[in-house]
Regions:
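Membrane-proximal, proline-rich intrinsically disordered regions
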Residues: 1-38
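Conserved, well-structured interaction surfaces
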Residues: 13, 49-118, 127, 141-149
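N-terminal carbohydrate-binding/catalytic regions of secreted carbohydrate-active enzymes
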Residues: 26-52, 65-70
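Flexible, glycine-rich active-site loops centered on histidine and acidic residues
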Residues: 120-122
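Aromatic- and glycine-enriched pocket-lining scaffold segments that form the walls
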Residues: 150-166
Length: 166
């Protein structure tokens, strides 16, 4: 889909909702995998499709494993940040920009809390805290742009979580 179509009023919500969906996918898998490793849920033949390795069930995450979770979170970040950029270039106003910043902020927060290193859009390898710094700015932007209490509350909830981690 070409960018010119993504910024049309009828497409904006779909773009933002796409970021939300990918983030929901990432959070679900990160939570599930973390619960297995922490023994918050007990394995019961969960190997193979949608399962976890015996090593993970025993509490060990192999380096380089579970890249799908990372991919989901990166896609959420990329989609939301692309929306922010496209909306800025088209001078889109209103709560849709606040929503894009909220989902970008939460995607960056998830990345910063779960991965020690960061690569943003093919750039250099950086400290994972870069995700949290980006999230802080995105939450602040959402607070400034939001016209509803629910959006401001979502941004106000995310920003101190990021600041506490930093």
């Amino acid at each position: 889909i070409q960018d010119e179509f993504l910024v049309q009023p009828a497409s904006r919500a779909g773009l933002v909702n796409g970021a939300q969906r990918r983030l929901n996918e990432a959070i679900g898998w990160i939570g599930y995998t973390g619960a297995i490793v922490a023994r918050e849920i007990m394995p019961g033949g969960q190997t193979g499709a949608y399962g976890h390795s015996v090593a993970a069930q025993g509490g060990h995450i192999q380096p380089g494993s579970y890249s799908g979770h990372f991919g989901d979170a990166q896609q959420a970040r990329f989609i939301a940040e692309t929306a922010i950029l496209l909306f800025k270039n088209e001078a889109v106003e209103g709560d849709i920009v606040a929503q894009a910043n909220i989902w970008a902020g939460y995607a960056n927060r998830v990345l910063g809390e779960n991965w020690c290193e960061a690569v943003i859009d093919g750039g250099p390898l950086e400290d994972g805290l870069v995700y949290l710094k980006r999230a802080e700015g995105q939450f602040s932007e959402a607070i400034n742009r939001a016209s509803t209490d629910s959006l401001r509350t979502a941004a106000y909830a995310g920003r101190p979580q990021v600041r506490a981690f930093l």
